[in-house]
Amino acid sequence: EFFMRQELIRINSTDGIELPGILYMPDNNTNKIVIHIHGLSGNFYENRFVDTLAKTYTDKGYALITFNNRGKDYITEMLKGDHAIVVGSCYELFEECILDIECIVNWVKDKGFNDITLQGHSYGCNKAIYYYDKKKEDCIKNIVLLAPCDIPKEIEIYTGDEYQNCIESATNLVKNNKEDEL
C-alpha cells in the first residue's frame, strides 16, 4: 500500500479539453516535479507502475503529476466546455500533444514548480521529446523515457509485406483530406 499526499485535478488543455489527473506530493514542500505522459491508449489510473514511481519520487522529494491526454483509450469522450467530444488514440493527431502538455507545464509552474522533469511511457516518450524540442523551456531540466517505442517499425512488423501499400494508402488519404478514413 502507498500512502502519500494526493490531489485529483482537472486542467483544461490549451484548446479547452478537460484533462483529469492526479498530483502526488512529498511530505515536504518542493519545487521539483515529474510530469508523467502516458502511452498510446493509456490513462493516468491504470498503469500500476506509476504508483511505485510516485512513491519513489515523493520519497526523494519530488512531486509527480500524471494526467489523461487526448490519446486516452482507443475511442472515448472528454469534456470540452459543457459538451463531450470524441477523442482517443484512434483520432489523435500527434502534434496536438503540445496542447495537452503545455497546459500541465503552465499549471505546475503556476503552483511554484520550476524544476520540471518530463517523463514519457511508451508513446508518451515521443510526446515528451517532441514537446521539449518545440518549446525548449528552461524550467524543463530532465527527460525520462520509460519503454520508448518506434511506431513506424511497429507498424512495419505488424503489416509485414503490406507495409508499403499501407503507407501509400495513408499518404493518399491525407492528400485527399480524408484523414478520418485512416
Question: What are the residue ranges of the model-derived segments?
Answer:
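N-terminal cap/lid segment of alpha/beta-hydrolase-fold proteins
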Residues: 3-29
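Active-site signature of alpha/beta-hydrolase-fold catalytic machinery across serine-
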Residues: 130-134
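Gly/Ala-rich beta-loop-alpha elbow adjacent to hydrolase catalytic centers
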Residues: 120-124, 128
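Structural motif
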Residues: 31-33, 115-117, 142
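Short beta-strand immediately N-terminal to the catalytic nucleophile in serine-hydrolase-like folds
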Residues: 118-120, 146
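Short, surface-exposed "cap/lid" segments of acyl-processing enzymes
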Residues: 27-74, 78-79
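Alpha/beta-hydrolase active-site loop
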Residues: 85-111
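The alpha/beta-hydrolase serine catalytic core
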Residues: 8, 19, 89-93, 139-182
